[in-house]
Amino acid sequence: MHVLVISQYYPPETGGPQNRLLSLVRGIQAEGHSVTVITEKPNYPTGVIWDDYRDGGLIVDRTYEEVPVRYCWIWEDHHKTTITRIRFFLSFVVLSILASFRVKNVDAVVASSPPLFVGLSGWIVSRLKRARFVFDVRDLWPDVAIAMGELRPGRAARIGKWLERFIYRKAHGITAVTNSFCEAIRGDAPAATPIRRVTNGTVPEDFVVSESRESLRRELSIGSGFVAVYAGNVGLAQGIEHFVDAAILMRDRGIDARMVVVGDGAAKEAIVRRAATYEDLNIEFRSRVGLKEAARYMAAADALLVPLSATPIFTKFIPSKLFDSMAAGKPLLLSVDGESRTILEDAGAGLWYPAEDPEGLVDAIAQLQRAPAAAEAMGSRGRTYVAHHFSRESQARILVRFLEELTGQSRPDAVQPSQHQLKEAS
């Protein structure tokens, strides 16, 4: 079976979506099937195409971990306005379709959203290739955009909802990252369309760090005492401004604990600016780092923060940060209700507090401080639980079995295509 994966998120960019797609591709390979990836030229987080990918034309062919990858030009999104975002998304739709012309003998097309428009690419390419089309859903758009105030109810929202349902109708199968997503999609998709949960998951080995916590703290200069670390995107969806309020409370109450935020994003500048207006806050902001360095920060911590906005729709989400943080073997401070909270409590991997609630966060930090042995046990339970239930390897196998069902190819019968097999378009 030859699977064509279409996504706007893929290495060498780093991040949760990129890591998930890479793991799924590895899983397809591990089962003996072949894979080709079509993605955008790397541009995260600035929206500007990386220098190494500027030359070579509209489509650049590279190999990443022995998988042929076609990197497509996109309309660069410097300012992230509504117009530039639409141009950004639609340019990928057009270029990804063109890029598919050189990919031959495709049995299944997996289009991973967001953005929603990538589903349009997947459907059109699957028609051109006469292949099965699987729509992979990692975000409930436009519902999330409306809930976050990024999209007003009106014509644009109605068009977005129509497009979402259109893609669901055209898909031969749908995968989604949470049970809540599956339930929401079932209400909009045809009754006969099969839906599978393929969660974000983690690679536990990525979070095994040989250095001691003490040496890591010295090297990373994060101080002594109790340290809670957040390593990830600092966007509106994460809702981390309450970290500043929690730091104020800890200062005023004389609680000897600090928070270290490692990451960048749309909300960071305003949060840093607000924190700077207060004196003697035990909160520090650092720039984003790669996965290996993030794992070192996590290993140096006493606890790991896993927040999301208090916007109700986020109770349907399971942030990928949840699984990675559990794999790091540290107790979690989770502020996401719903499925995420259920996983945390089933694993006994940490403490939950209400989203964007600084009082709840401070109380949870104090509770872990008072019981270091119990906190350590939480971390150990979390690592064991996530390795058993949510490894990306196991999630990739779920996807492969689903693709085999849809294509009727239960056993591998294809070899990995080389760059030479990406034939010239006629």
Report each predicted region and the residues it spans.
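Carbohydrate-associated surface elements
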Residues: 180, 201
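Acidic anion/phosphate-binding donor-loop and adjacent secondary structure
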Residues: 186, 192, 202-219, 239
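Nucleotide-activated donor-binding/catalytic signature segment of Leloir-type glycosyltransferases, i.e.
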Residues: 262-263, 268-296
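Conserved acidic donor-binding segment of nucleotide-sugar-dependent glycosyltransferases
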Residues: 346, 351-358, 367-373
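Conserved donor-binding/catalytic core segment of Leloir-type glycosyltransferases
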Residues: 222-238, 243-248
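N-terminal subdomain of nucleotide-sugar transferases
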Residues: 1-65, 250, 415, 420-426
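A short, well-ordered alpha-helix in the C-terminal region of glycosyltransferases
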Residues: 360, 367, 374-388, 398
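Short hydrophobic beta-strand element within catalytic cores of glycosyltransferases
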Residues: 303-306, 324-335
